[in-house]
Design a protein with these regions (language model features):
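Hydrophobic beta-strand anchors of alpha/beta hydrolase catalytic cores
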Residues: 56-57, 87, 110
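Structural microenvironment flanking redox-active thiols in thiol-disulfide oxidoreductases
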Residues: 88-100
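The canonical Cys-X-X-Cys-His
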Residues: 64-67, 110
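Short acidic-hydrophobic, aromatic-tinged amphipathic segments that line or gate anion-handling sites
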Residues: 38-44
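Short active-site neighborhood of thiol/selenol oxidoreductases, capturing the structured segment around
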Residues: 50-62
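N-terminal targeting signals for export/organelle localization
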Residues: 1-35
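Non-catalytic, surface beta->alpha helical segment in thiol-disulfide oxidoreductase systems
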Residues: 106, 111-141
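Typically the conserved alpha-helix immediately C-terminal to a functionally engaged Cys/Sec
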Residues: 66-82
Length: 141
């Protein structure tokens, strides 16, 4: 067998191994990095939480890989904004009624509320500075 074929097979095998390991790592990832400032909303506290001040809510589900990628960013935003805005998560599988009321059809969806009213919405994963600018705009309105 020619040397170049062996090299191609080795490179392909290593690439395949990298992809599989990356997938398995992401699959095991959690959506929550354990921030003490991050709120976990439910049917009983959703409306009360968003009714005063600025609240960023991440609508997510356990099976959503992009949601898992976004999890650490949301936790970081919660820590960085603890003194000026609330940052929260709502599992759409557990609280489907709240998701439906808010028109959530794709996830991850991040919505910023100010005094109970939606002021901005973003669907899909964006960089941290994008979500921070959403919070900052709502605070300055």
């Amino acid at each position: 067998m020619p040397t170049w074929i062996i090299i191609v097979i080795i490179i392909f095998s290593l690439l395949t191994l990298f992809v599989v390991l990356s997938y398995l790592k992401l699959k095991k990832a959690t959506n929550d990095t354990g921030s003490f400032n991050l709120l976990h909303l439910s049917d009983s506290d959703f409306q009360k939480t968003i009714s005063k001040g600025v609240t960023l809510v991440d609508f997510w589900a356990d099976w959503c890989m992009p949601c898992k990628l976004l999890g650490p960013t949301i936790s970081n935003l919660a820590d960085n904004n603890a003194d000026k805005a609330k940052v929260a998560k709502l599992n759409i599988e557990t609280y489907q009624k709240i998701a439906a009321i808010n028109g959530i059809s794709s996830i991850p969806t991040v919505v910023v509320f100010k005094n109970g009213k939606e002021v901005e919405r973003s669907v899909s994963v964006k960089p941290k500075h994008y979500y921070q600018s959403m919070i900052d705009k709502a605070l300055n309105k």
